[in-house]
Design a protein with these regions (language model features):
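Active-site phosphate-binding strand-loop segment of PLP-dependent enzymes
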Residues: 57-113
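Short loop-beta-helix segment that forms the pyridoxal 5′-phosphate
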Residues: 1-21
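Active-site PLP attachment segment
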Residues: 131-164
Length: 231
């Protein structure tokens, strides 16, 4: 929670489970909900949205015009959530998170962002793209694997929302929690990465070097503005 400047966080067994469990019970928390989902969202987000059994609208990938045109069709008092990622793993592009959050404010929508490929790697403390760009989405999904090298996933949000997920999500209620050993390891890793900004800088440098080497060898890669190298 502290990493993302949120009131509370809830740890689940993986980032996949955190996405699926959270999005899957949204309609119970917000009756009449409409979820607006980026067309390239991760399978875990898609699965969660399907489980929610609420109305959903797919918008073109990172397309602000298309997103706004779809938001305009919904009444301001209709509960809505914009679900998207910060860094997309397949194309390696970064979403315009500030502008999406601005649209959410304009049309009275909540924001749900998956920062799985960004936590530990962006921002002064490793809080992800949102920390780097100083924006505050309503709900953040992250992982304790990948950059942190341990296991587990989490969501971070305000206290009321976290309490609701804890009460409704079967994937949290009816399974064994992470072991204290893994929790201790994850906490130590988060603290370490927070304090060592040079690791984030080093990764970006190595990523750019690898991209150049592929290009020099004639191996095509997708151009992007993140650390991921899609060949």
């Amino acid at each position: 929670a502290d990493l993302h400047n949120k009131d509370r966080a809830l740890v689940l067994t993986s980032g996949y489970v955190a996405n699926e469990a959270t999005l899957g019970v949204m309609s119970k928390i917000l009756p009449g909900l409409v979820i607006l989902s980026d067309e390239k969202n991760h399978a875990s987000m898609i699965s969660g949205i399907q489980r929610a059994r609420c109305d959903k609208i797919i918008f073109n990938h990172n397309d602000l015009y298309d997103l706004e045109s779809k938001l305009k069709t919904l009444p301001l008092d209709t509960p809505k959530i914009i679900a998207f990622e910060s860094v997309y793993s397949m194309d390696a592009d970064i979403a315009p998170v500030e502008k999406i959050c601005n649209l959410a404010d304009k049309y009275n929508a909540l924001t749900y962002i998956d920062e799985v490929h960004a936590v530990g790697l962006y921002g002064p403390n490793g809080g992800g793209v949102c920390e780097e760009r100083n924006v505050q989405p309503d709900i953040i999904n992250g992982t304790l694997a990948k950059a942190y090298g341990v296991q587990g996933g989490y969501i971070a949000a305000d206290k009321t929302f976290i309490d609701a997920i804890r009460s409704y999500a079967p994937a949290f209620i009816f399974t064994t929690s992470m072991s204290p050993v893994l929790c201790a390891g994850a906490l130590a890793s988060v603290k370490y990465v927070k304090e060592h900004k040079e690791l984030r800088m080093m990764l970006q440098v190595k990523s750019e070097e690898l991209k150049r080497k592929f290009i020099d060898k004639g191996i095509p890669i997708l151009e992007n503005n993140s650390h991921i190298v899609p060949v």
